[in-house]
Curated annotation (Swiss-Prot):
Belongs to the ClpX chaperone family. This is ATP-dependent Clp protease ATP-binding subunit ClpX. It comes from Exiguobacterium sp. (strain ATCC BAA-1283 / AT1b). ATP-dependent specificity component of the Clp protease. It directs the protease to specific substrates. Can perform chaperone functions in the absence of ClpP. GO terms for cellular component: HslUV protease complex. InterPro entries: AAA+_ATPase, ATP-dep_Clp_protease_ClpX, ATPase_AAA_core, Clp_ATPase_C, Clp_protease_ATP-bd_su_ClpX, ClpX_bact, P-loop_NTPase, Znf_CppX_C4. The gene is clpX. One of its GO terms (molecular function) is protein dimerization activity. ATP binds at residues 117-124. Signal peptide: none annotated.
């Protein structure tokens, strides 16, 4: 509960009891207040116990090729996007290290825009990049943002997520990475400016301009809207790397109109049509983003463009098995903890990939497919000591048969079948 001065009704520090007139600052928290003197005392205690943290530096920045090689361990395909990201991130942190030493040339910030369909790996690339560099990372959804003063989330709340990711170490957060997803959803409805207020489209783009370029932002520590009696966290966004991503559905048509070429094989040849659309996507330019509905000032603060392609069946199968944190490996490990071996046949993996393509969910849908199929297995195995091995076949994925349970006595059990000798 808040503490009040009974005579004057003033707010008081919840720790030492001093009123706001007796201290220089009174910082508001969720239901409590703390004065600057108590903050200083707490800070001294923490520093004595933990020691002063070293200044955040990036002296040993991985080279672009090293970054790409690490990304290969976690993300399948998308080599073009990996190269663009690796170079941009390397240059960004090299620029931070240069600091103010280059008096003759000012090194500009290189924020990144990623264009690619749902489930192509945009979020995973950004997450992996932050893990490679060991920097704070935050994800935001552009569709939840609105212009200040309207119902929704202020853009400053994105910065709060980054500060929270850095355990409220502002200096560390100032060198972090923010990924804003669904950026295409805040495109204005037409290329021409509207006379009506677009609070979740162009208004949000305008609000994002300053933090993308670099400014000292005031962030409410409790989140939500700014209100009186609230002390703000000051954070400099100059060295924060912003990566924005979106599907930009239909941008191929914008590119096609610009280059004046038709999509070849649009008829029945699905493969040619998709390959040609991906080729068009690879040719996307900043002017195409403007035609799509992003304002020129916003595009200008995203100088690096990386395009991702739709994942085919082969790539989805590799995603299931090859990365260090591959889904199949995770489930194999999960059953291994119950002393049971799990095996997916090659045909089963292909069926999972086909189902993800059919659902148009890309790599993002792989986990939900396996979760659905593994539910009965994960429910049954812990309660049975006689199961030695579980085999998932293509018929398991298509629903024609259940998983095969190889028992410790050598027999095989399958849903709907009688026991048979292995």
């Amino acid at each position: 509960m808040f503490k009040f001065n009974e005579e004057k009704g003033q707010l008081k520090c919840s720790f030492c009891g001093k009123s706001q007139e007796q201290v220089r600052k009174l910082v508001a928290g969720p239901g409590v207040y703390i004065c600057d003197e108590c903050i200083e005392l707490c800070n001294e205690i923490v520093e004595e116990e933990l020691g002063v943290e070293e200044e955040v530096e990036f002296k040993d920045i991985p080279k672009p090729q090293e970054i790409r090689n690490i990304l290969d361990d976690y993300v399948i395909g998308q080599d073009r996007a990996k190269r663009a990201l690796s170079v941009a991130v390397y240059n960004h942190y090299k620029r931070i290290n240069a600091g103010g030493r280059s008096d003759d040339v000012e090194l500009a910030k290189s924020n990144i825009v990623m264009i690619g369909p749902t489930g192509s790996g945009k979020t995973l690339l950004a997450q992996t990049m932050a893990r490679v560099l060991n920097v704070p990372f935050a994800i935001a959804d552009a569709t939840s943002l609105t212009e200040a003063g309207y119902v929704g989330e202020d853009v400053e709340n994105i910065l709060l997520k980054l500060i929270q990711s850095a355990d409220y170490d502002v200096e560390k957060a100032e060198k972090g990475i923010i990924y804003i997803d669904e950026i295409d959803k805040i495109a204005r409805k037409s290329e021409n400016p509207s006379i009506t207020r677009d609070v979740s489209g162009e208004g949000v783009q305008q609000a994002l301009l300053k933090i993308l370029e670099g400014t000292t932002a005031s962030v409410p520590p409790q989140g939500g809207r700014k209100h009186p009696h609230q002390e703000f966290i000051q954070i400099d966004t100059t060295n924060i790397l912003f990566i924005v991503g979106g599907a930009f559905a239909g941008i191929e048509s914008v590119v096609k109109r610009r280059i004046g070429k038709k999509v070849i094989g649009f008829g029945n040849d699905q493969e040619n049509r998709e390959l040609t659309q991906e080729d068009l996507l690879a040719r996307a330019l900043p002017e195409d983003l403007q035609k799509f509905g992003l304002i020129p000032e916003f595009i200008g603060r995203l100088p690096v463009m990386a395009t991702l392609t739709t994942l085919d069946e082969e790539a989805l199968v590799e995603i299931l098995t090859k990365p260090k944190n591959a889904l199949v490996r995770q489930y194999e490990k999960m059953l291994e903890l119950d002393d049971v071996e799990l095996t997916f046949t090659d045909e089963a993996l292909i069926e999972i990939a086909k189902l993800a393509i059919k659902r148009k969910t890309g790599a993002r849908g792989l986990r939900s497919i396996i979760e659905e199929m593994m539910l009965d297995v994960m429910f049954t195995v812990p309660s049975r000591d006689d199961i030695e091995k579980v085999i998932i076949t293509d018929e398991t994925i298509t629903g024609l048969a259940g998983p095969k349970y190889v028992l410790r006595d050598g027999t095989v059990e399958q849903t709907g079948d009688n026991k048979e000798t292995a």
